A protein has these predicted regions:
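P/S/T/G-enriched low-complexity
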Residues: 2-6, 10-11, 37-538
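Short glycine- and Lys/Arg-enriched binding-loop motifs that mark or flank ligand-binding interfaces
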Residues: 14, 32, 415
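Alpha-helical structural signal
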Residues: 19-22, 28, 56, 308
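Glycine-centered recognition micro-motifs in short, flexible terminal segments and loops
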Residues: 6-26
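Alpha-helical hydrophobic helix detector
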Residues: 25-39
Length: 538
């Protein structure tokens, strides 16, 4: 190497000037590329967040109550794709992305499916985000992808078979105060129970259960008046009574009214002294929804009927889709009677005849009268009623619906009773008595490990919910009356709760209620429990 060249090389090696510029020049390209990558990736991340928000909103909207997809799925009779939900999800996604720029080649896809009462929605997307700085290293775009999944439950379709005890014991006045009011004015069975009868004795035929000299506290034309009295103004009826110490109750009705009983109670009052009255001028009410009013005396069946009308309100407020619930009223004495069969029309008024609401409000009119051949008379045939209810559900055999579609409703039986089974029978009308009047229970006072009529229902998948309205102790007991049935009835009370618990689907399907408000609250709780358990089960 020539000497002058070696000199230049040596100088270059020893010279430290300009090193920063040279190093910067060497590192500039990768540094700028890194900064550019961060900017481009940040832009892509922001775009992905917008796309994800749109996907989340689309999935949720597709399954929201009252959305096209939700309503369409609720009407499907099987499982599969919910087309209306897919369309709705896509529309919501597109709407949320409308007006947003900064992406290309967007592809989105939605699926909405129904399986039983479960709904599932999935929204996926992919899009290209243009880049600026990354082009330096040959990258022309960033692709972002994502997915959103949502789930919901359809409201279950439920059928409610309200199996309602309307036997004589349900004619007990609804509260202690109402029982006192009735006992003070009721002439029925006064000779047997001089402290006063708290039941609205209800047998309608003359000489059927009440006679002037055999049972009554004063002459009643051989008719039972307890139920009639419970339906009229208490002050109005009291004002018809006159003092007469020759009768056990020390009272009497005007002779002209007695001879025309019971219709004379409602005939117009004629002018003149009370002793000459031939009409009472009273107006009967079909139901008594409030205790303590002068218009009537509330019976347990009135309280149950009012509670059922309130149940309809709860059902109407709770339904999420049209026709979600059907309810039927099935009272029983000896036979089960389809008083108002299953109906989806439960939003009527208690004052509108022809509606299930009106039928429920007037449930007390079905109290055992010994004239209704549909219900029969005498005793309380709970097991027979449950067997009959089973026959009404899906033909009486086989598995029942799971509530996932309108054509496969889940059936619930609501048994409302005081639980005292009595197998005696009285011919209709005004027939003779047959069978034992000794009270028992549906498990024969704990002699049966299970209750066959209840097990049949539960074995098919029917849910059985029980409302026990405690049978009231008879006090004092007249041991000479009706073969000492009062003693047997009292001794039976201890076995009732356990027997009804056996009937219920589980312990949380059993409730006890005594007062009118408790009865209303219990029925409301039973309905809400049915909704809750239907969701959990499915």
């Amino acid at each position: 190497m020539p000497s002058h060249l070696r000199t230049y090389v040596s100088r270059f090696r020893r010279d430290r000037r300009g090193n920063v510029a040279i190093i910067f020049a060497i590192t500039a390209i990768p540094l700028i590329s890194a900064i550019g990558c961060a900017v481009d990736y940040s832009s892509a991340t922001r775009m992905k967040a917008k796309l994800q928000t749109a996907a989340d909103a689309a999935g949720i909207a597709a399954l929201s109550q009252k959305s096209p997809g939700f309503l369409a799925a609720s009407l499907m009779t099987g499982n599969g794709t919910v087309t209306a939900g897919v369309t709705d999800a896509n529309n919501v996604f597109d709407g949320n992305m409308s007006g947003i720029t900064g992406y290309q080649n967007l592809v989105r896809s939605s699926t909405v499916t129904k399986t039983g009462i479960k709904l599932a929605a999935t929204v996926t997307y992919t899009a290209d985000v243009p880049v600026t700085f990354l082009k330096v290293i040959g990258v022309q775009k960033l692709t972002v992808t994502g997915a959103s999944s949502s789930a919901a439950s359809l409201p279950p379709y439920l059928d409610f078979y309200l199996t309602l005890d309307v036997s004589g014991s349900m004619g007990l006045a609804s509260t202690a105060a109402e029982q006192t009011r009735l006992s003070q004015i009721n002439p029925d069975n006064y000779r047997q129970y001089p402290t006063g009868c708290t039941f609205a004795c209800h047998f309608a035929p003359q000489n059927s259960a009440c006679t002037n000299t055999g049972t009554q506290g004063y002459p009643t034309n051989n008719y039972c008046l307890g139920y009639k009295i419970s339906r009229v103004s208490q002050s109005g009826y009291t004002n018809l009574l006159m003092t007469n110490n020759s009768y056990p109750k020390k009272q009497e009705l005007p002779t002209g009214i007695v001879s025309g009983l019971p219709n004379s109670l409602y005939a117009p009052k004629n002018p003149g002294p009370k002793s000459g009255l031939t009409g009472g001028g009273l107006t009967a009410v079909p139901n008594c929804k409030v205790a303590g009013t002068d218009d009537c005396i509330q019976l347990r069946l009135d309280a149950v009927g009012y509670a059922v009308t309130e149940l309809f309100k709860t059902a109407n407020e709770s339904k999420k889709v049209p026709d979600q619930f059907r309810i039927g009223l099935y009272p029983f004495i000896r036979y089960l009677y389809a008083y108002f069969p299953l109906t989806k029309n439960i939003n009527g008024l208690p004052t509108t005849p022809g509606t299930i609401n009106y039928a429920a409000a007037n449930l007390a009119t079905l109290l055992d009268t010994n004239v209704n051949t549909d219900l029969g008379s005498g005793g309380t045939h709970i097991s027979a009623a449950l067997t009959s209810v089973n026959g009404l559900i899906s033909g009486g055999s086989g598995a029942v619906g799971d509530g996932s579609t309108p054509t496969t409703p889940q059936p619930y039986v609501f048994l409302v009773t005081d639980g005292a089974q009595n197998n005696q029978v009285k011919g209709v009308p005004n027939g003779s008595w047959s069978g034992s009047n000794h009270a028992t229970t549906i498990d024969n006072q704990n002699n049966l490990a299970t209750v066959p009529s209840c097990e049949t229902l539960k074995g098919r998948g029917v849910k059985v919910s029980v409302l026990y309205i405690p049978y009231q102790k008879i006090d004092p007991v007249n041991t000479s009356f009706a073969g000492n049935e009062g003693t047997y009835a009292n001794e039976n009370i201890q076995y009732i709760p356990a027997s009804l618990r056996k009937c219920a689907s589980s312990l949380d399907f059993f409730r006890t209620a005594n007062t009118p408000q408790e009865i209303q609250d219990a029925l409301d709780a039973m309905f809400k429990h049915a909704l809750q358990t239907a969701h959990i089960t499915h």
